C-alpha cells in the first residue's frame, strides 16, 4: 500500500547536503511505491507562530495567519510519514524547520485535547562536524510527547560544502530508509 510522505526540508541550500540526503530518501520511497511531497521551507513565506491560541477554529485553515503554511497543512493532514530534514545549526535544527513545525500546532488546536495526528517520522540531518546529540534529544522528546513513531534517523556529519555527502554511506542509508517504507 502506497504511503503519503511529506518532507519538511529546512535547508536554505537548494543543492546542499541536506537536500542530497532528502533526494536519496525520496528516490527510495518512490521506488517502493510511495507518494512523496517535499517542501523547501526556505523558499516559502512562513510567518513565525505568534502564540495567539486562535488556531483550530477552521479545520480547512487551521492557523489564524494566512501564508504558505496553507500549502503544508493539507499535505500534513494526509501524510502517513513526516520527514524532518535540516542542516545542524548551533546544535539544533534550522530556524526554517523550527518555524514550520511550531506552526503545525494549529492542527493540534483542532482537537479539544490538543492531540496531534498520529504519524510516523524520520529525521534527516547534515552537519559540518558532528554533535547531533542535542537534535536527537529534541527529536526523541518530540516523538514521545506527540505520539509519533520514528522510522529512523540519517545523521551525516563532516559535510561542509555542497556535494560533500556524495560517496558517504549516509546517502545510501537515506535511500534504503526511504525504500523500506511501504
Located regions from the model:
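Short, glycine-/small-residue-rich phosphate/pyrophosphate-handling segment
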Residues: 95-96, 110-153
Amino acid at each position: 500500500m502506497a504511503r503519503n510522505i511529506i518532507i519538511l526540508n529546512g535547508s536554505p541550500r537548494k543543492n546542499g547536503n541536506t537536500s542530497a540526503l532528502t533526494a536519496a530518501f525520496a528516490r527510495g520511497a518512490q521506488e517502493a511505491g510511495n507518494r512523496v511531497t517535499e517542501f523547501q521551507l526556505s523558499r516559502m513565506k512562513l510567518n513565525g507562530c505568534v502564540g495567539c491560541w486562535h488556531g483550530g477554529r477552521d479545520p480547512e485553515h487551521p492557523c489564524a495567519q494566512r501564508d504558505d503554511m496553507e500549502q503544508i497543512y493539507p499535505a500534513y493532514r494526509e501524510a502517513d510519514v513526516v520527514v524532518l530534514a535540516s542542516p545542524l545549526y548551533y546544535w539544533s535544527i534550522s530556524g526554517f524547520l523550527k518555524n514550520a513545525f511550531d506552526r503545525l500546532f494549529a492542527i493540534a488546536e483542532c482537537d479539544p485535547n490538543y492531540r496531534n495526528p498520529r504519524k510516523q517520522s524520520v529525521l534527516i540531518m547534515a552537519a559540518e562536524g558532528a554533535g547531533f546529540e542535542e537534535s536527537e534529544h529534541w527529536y526523541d522528546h518530540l516523538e514521545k510527547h506527540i505520539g509519533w513513531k520514528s522510522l529512523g534517523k540519517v545523521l551525516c556529519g563532516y559535510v561542509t560544502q555542497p556535494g560533500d555527502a556524495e560517496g558517504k554511506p549516509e546517502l545510501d542509508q537515506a535511500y534504503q530508509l526511504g525504500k523500506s517504507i511501504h
